[in-house]
Each structure stands twice: as C-alpha cells, then as structure tokens.
Regions:
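Conserved core segment of the aminotransferase class I/II
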Residues: 118-199, 299
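Walker B catalytic acidic pair
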Residues: 97-98
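Conserved glycine-rich beta-strand-loop-beta hairpin in the small C-terminal domain of fold type I
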Residues: 17, 192-206, 218-233
Length: 307
C-alpha cells in the first residue's frame, strides 16, 4: 500500500538532526516523531520500541557517520541493532544518508563503520535499508555524483520510478569524476586537502569557545572528528534569544530549533555552528560575538529567574 494512502503515517527523526530531512517527510504528510540522540547514535531502546509496536511508522532518517549536527559516529552495536530491527510495518525503511562517509577532519582518526547493507542482509532484512551518498561536499555542491545502494529487489523498484523522472544521468559528469579521482585512494587524497582547509577553522571555533565559556557551566559543545558542523547547547531556554542577538550584531545562524522536527526544540537550547564557509578572520570574530551573546542571554535569563 503506498505510504500516501496510509492515514496517520509517521517517520522517526533522530534529533538534533538535519532540517532538510525533516522537511522532506513533513512535505509528504508524515507525522514526525523525534528520537533522542546519545553518544552512540539514536537511542535504540526508543527506536526498537516504537517500530515494533506501530505499523504506521514507515521509516527513520539516519546520518551514520559524523551526523549533522552532532558529529556522532554510530557505534557498531547501534548499526547491528538497526539491521536487526523487527518493525511491525513490513514496508518500514531505514533512510541511511551516508553524506559524510569520507569527510574526516582528522585523517589519523578516521572511523570505519559496518556496512549497513551487509548487516541487514545477514539479519534477514535485506530490503529494510536505502543508503545514499553523493559528492556534493566533495566536488560540486548540488551538481556532483549521487548514488543509492540497497537490495536487488529495492533497486529494481527504484529504477522503475526513476525511468519516468529522467532519461539517464549526466554521463559526462560521471566520466569527469572517474578520470579525476580514479579510485578510492584518489578520493581520500582529495578529502585530505579538504580536511587541511577545515581543520584550522574547527579548531579556532573550539579554542575561542573554550577561552570564553569553559568552566562557566552555561554551555556545552561537540568537537567532531569529521563532518561539517559543531553542535552547541546553551542552558534551557536560551538558544532562540542567542541566535536573535547574534543576528542583531551581524552574525547569522540557522534558526534555533532547526535541528528538531517542525523547528521545535522542546528545550530551546541547540544551535548548529557551521565553520566551513567563512574565512578565518570572520570565523574568529563571529565566534567571539557568539560567545558574548551566549553570556549576555544566559545572564539575563538567570537574573529574570532569580527576580
């Protein structure tokens, strides 16, 4: 039965997570159910309980490596528990967006994860996962090469839809990528150059946050080994006002709450920091403004609470 014909259809959304994932499933009429994250990935106790008890839950979003925005790498146990899920809905699917599969900032700390396709096959769930990746953050944003991996049965199904959407891929672009990279070693060498650009930016943000906020007990943030983001938590109720104050001083952030379904962070505390685009001078200034904004907003909240 097509999902569009299922009343009260639902989709699991690990959060903090990727706002565009949430927007896609919301656009298609899914009810979005947040799933808390921990240091190993989504809380699998919650995932297992939900999918085993509700056949209107049709899927879950996952970014298994350097997850956006927390930079978490799913543990082997988490991945194996995903592969061994026993969903009540027989058409339940894991949307495994491996967007940052080669995006390490520290090459010597590269973390390999189990292949979800193989794990699902071994667990007797070969059709349960779609895995995606692209070169959008490797070569050309929005115009690189993309790929999907799944079971033979799923790929036949996907091709059946794709043939009506497009005559075929851009084969010249495919050839361009193959000739440039040649093999996985070529991709890794290229990504090491990306890492050399990004690493100083991430380290500059982390240093300033430590200099300005460490030990105050008013914030915590991640120091990822890869990916594109730093996840920052204020005290409860301070994120929106912090982003607003930063905006008034010329520093723009993704809206507070964007990392949660419907843009609703129930604690109003998570902010996604993206140090990748700006130059080093602007990054340092913006981070100092951000840290100052966190202090001001937090102090105002604490004063008002004490009054």
């Amino acid at each position: 039965k097509p999902w569009c014909q299922v009343e009260d259809r639902k989709f699991l959304c690990p959060a903090p997570g990727y706002d565009r994932h949430f927007a896609i499933t919301e656009h298609f009429g899914m009810k979005l159910i947040p799933v808390p994250m921990n240091e190993n990935g989504p809380d699998m106790d919650v995932v297992e309980e939900l999918v085993s008890s509700d056949d209107t839950i049709k899927g879950i979003w996952c970014v298994p490596k350097y997850e956006n925005p927390m930079g978490i790498v799913f543990s082997d146990e988490t991945i194996q528990r995903f592969a061994n899920l026993k969903p009540l809905a027989k058409d339940f699917r894991i949307f495994w967006d491996n967007a940052y599969c080669v995006h390490s900032i520290y090459q010597n700390e590269e973390t390999d994860i189990p292949d979800i396709i193989s794990e699902c096959e071994k667990a007797g769930n070969p059709d349960m996962v779609y895995e995606f990746c692209s070169t959008s953050k490797i070569t050309f944003p929005g115009s690189g090469i993309s790929a999907v991996a799944s079971s033979p049965a799923n790929l036949i199904d996907i091709k059946g839809f794709l043939k009506y959407a497009t005559i075929g891929p851009d084969k010249i672009n495919q050839l361009r990528h193959v000739r440039y990279f040649k093999n996985i070693a070529g991709i890794k060498a290229h990504m090491a150059k990306h890492a050399d650009i990004l690493r100083p930016k991430f380290e500059a943000v982390d240093k300033i946050l430590n200099d300005e906020l460490n030990g105050l007990g008013i914030a915590e943030w991640t120091k990822p080994n890869g990916g594109y983001f730093i996840s920052f938590n204020t005290l409860k109720g301070c994120a929106s006002d912090t982003v607003t104050l930063c905006s008034k001083m010329g520093v723009a952030f993704t809206p507070a709450g964007a990392t949660y379904p419907y843009g609703n962070d129930p604690e109003d505390q998570n902010i996604r920091i993206a140090p990748t685009f700006a130059n080093m001078k602007d990054i340092k200034l913006a981070t100092k403004i951000f840290a100052l904004s966190v202090k001001i907003v937090t102090l105002e909240k604490l004063i008002n609470k004490a009054a």
